[in-house]
Swiss-Prot record:
Receptor for glucocorticoids (GC). Has a dual mode of action: as a transcription factor that binds to glucocorticoid response elements (GRE), both for nuclear and mitochondrial DNA, and as a modulator of other transcription factors. Affects inflammatory responses, cellular proliferation and differentiation in target tissues. Involved in chromatin remodeling. Plays a role in rapid mRNA degradation by binding to the 5' UTR of target mRNAs and interacting with PNRC2 in a ligand-dependent manner which recruits the RNA helicase UPF1 and the mRNA-decapping enzyme DCP1A, leading to RNA decay. GO terms for cellular component: centrosome; chromosome; cytoplasm; mitochondrion; nuclear speck; nucleus; spindle. It comes from the Eukaryota. Heteromultimeric cytoplasmic complex with HSP90AA1, HSPA1A/HSPA1B, and FKBP5 or another immunophilin such as PPID, STIP1, or the immunophilin homolog PPP5C. Upon ligand binding FKBP5 dissociates from the complex and FKBP4 takes its place, thereby linking the complex to dynein and mediating transport to the nucleus, where the complex dissociates. Probably forms a complex composed of chaperones HSP90 and HSP70, co-chaperones CDC37, PPP5C, TSC1 and client protein TSC2, CDK4, AKT, RAF1 and NR3C1; this complex does not contain co-chaperones STIP1/HOP and PTGES3/p23. Directly interacts with UNC45A. Composed of three domains: a modulating N-terminal domain, a DNA-binding domain and a C-terminal ligand-binding domain. The ligand-binding domain is required for correct chromosome segregation during mitosis although ligand binding is not required. Disulfide bonds: none annotated. GO terms for molecular function: DNA-binding transcription factor activity; nuclear glucocorticoid receptor activity; nuclear receptor activity; sequence-specific DNA binding; steroid binding; steroid hormone binding; zinc ion binding. The keyword Metal-binding applies. The gene is NR3C1. There is a cross-link at residues 139, 155 (Glycyl lysine isopeptide (Lys-Gly) (interchain with G-Cter in SUMO)). InterPro entries: Glcrtcd_rcpt, Nuclear_hormone_rcpt_NR3, Znf_hrmn_rcpt, Znf_NHR/GATA. This is Glucocorticoid receptor.
Length: 314
């Protein structure tokens, strides 16, 4: 009894296979007349099975005789056949459908190139492509778009090193512009350049943008002036005069002062003649220095300032 109970749910859980149904169908054919009322449910199952078997046969013979299969199949209608059988789930293996699929394949390469230039026209910067062959035009549009972008990048890369190379007077890469900077360039406290023998206006404009780089190199010169001023008295003053003759007298804080040049008129603060050596300038106020006071080359008024500062600390 327990075995019969255990066998019952297995039959419910697992459906019958095709062989089981066929054997049961043969038994039903033999017992169809004897057991009328009890086998009535099985006859309905047999009828549904016959319908599905007939549909499978229709699908198997569809490749050989599609016209016969459409007339015999109850699942087909003329509307679905006229619509290329796209809505029928049983028409996937039809010859007529395959033939129409080949015709669709012939139409696909005609439709896809017509759709691609529309997308490229929207993506690119309004580049028309009205010709008959759109695929090479799409490639040329991409190349033209890249060529439009790359010259700007190359120009930006060229503009960057020009300023860096121009900051070093020793480099002769740029040519006349570099020689003009190294010979005639004089940095001032206002951050501007004296321009002499300039042929074009573009060079002078570029030199106006470069005094930021010109402020940095005179810093070691200022440290040499400071050390020589602390070292000895009059000898350091004469050495400072020779250093300032190059036109780059420097503050201690790194800002360059307007030095003396033989071809430039002397500033109003200097009282000496232009033919002699340039005056020694105060490192605080750029006035004419009176001497080295408290280790700093200053004028008379700044000497008092340093005196008060030093005495206030003591």
């Amino acid at each position: 009894a327990s075995a019969a109970v255990s066998a019952a749910p297995t039959e419910k859980e697992f459906p019958k296979t095709h062989s089981d149904v066929s054997s049961e169908q043969q038994n039903l054919k033999g017992q169809k007349g004897s057991n009328g009322g009890s086998m009535k449910l099985h006859t309905t199952d047999q009828s549904t099975f016959d319908i599905w078997r007939k549909k499978l046969q229709d699908l198997e013979f569809s490749s050989e005789s599609p016209s016969k299969e459409t007339s015999d199949s109850p699942w087909r209608s003329d509307i679905l056949i006229d619509e290329n059988c796209l809505l029928s789930p049983l028409a996937g293996e039809d010859d007529s459908f395959l033939l129409e699929g080949s015709s669709n394949e012939d139409c696909k390469p005609l439709l896809l190139p017509d759709a691609k230039p529309k997308i490229k026209d929207n993506g690119d910067l309004i580049l028309p492509s009205p010709n008959s062959v759109p695929l090479p035009q799409v490639k040329t549009e991409k190349e033209d778009f890249i060529e439009l972008c790359t010259p700007g990048v190359i120009k930006q890369e060229k503009l960057g090193p020009v300023y860096c190379q121009a900051s070093f007077p020793g480099a002769n890469i740029i040519g006349n512009k570099m020689s003009a900077i190294s010979v005639h360039g004089v940095s001032t406290s206002g951050g501007q350049m004296y321009h002499y023998d300039m042929n074009t206006a573009s060079l002078s404009q570029q030199q106006d943008q470069k005094p930021i780089f010109k402020v940095i190199p005179p810093i070691p010169v200022g440290s040499e002036n400071w050390n020589r001023c602390q070292g000895s008295g009059d000898d350091s003053l004469t050495s400072l005069g020779t250093l300032n003759f190059s036109g780059r007298s420097v503050f201690s804080n790194g800002y360059s002062s307007p030095g003396m040049r033989p071809d430039v008129s002397s500033p109003p603060s200097s009282s000496s003649a232009a033919t002699g050596p340039p005056p020694k300038l105060c490192l605080v106020c750029s006035d004419e220095a009176s001497g080295c006071h408290y280790g700093v080359l200053t004028c008379g008024s700044c000497k008092v300032f340093f005196k008060r500062a030093v005495e206030g600390q003591h």
